[in-house]
Amino acid sequence: MPTDERLAVDLLARTEYGRVAASLRAMPFLACARHIVADGRLLLRMHRGHGYHRACVGHVVAYGSDNLNRARPGCAEGRWSVEIVGKCAAVEPTAAELELFGPAPRSVDGGAPFDPVYLRVTPQFVTVDRQGAT
């Protein structure tokens, strides 16, 4: 695994949520997703009811996460952001992966039941941006 990929995996493990970017009917969109990294694979959990997963599966997507709103000035890790670009596929997570995700939200958008869908992003490009790390 290349150095940037290892660093990206380490940094992503420090956060729980990020944003997936894809195209829906030729229009770009961003959607929030819960993520885990298991065996070097990026797995996402999204709400099926929004339908965003249909635009992701079988296509190249970008997924990003960061600590920009949590990093304090002078902290040793500094500010960082990670972006992974790769092919997306629908998956059924293992019991161990489901445990890593933790409990799903009960509802979304003011009361609709959360219906999870799971996606895997196979990295083709990884970008790590670090600022102020010591």
What are these regions (language model features)?
Residues 1-19:
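Short, basic/aromatic recognition patches
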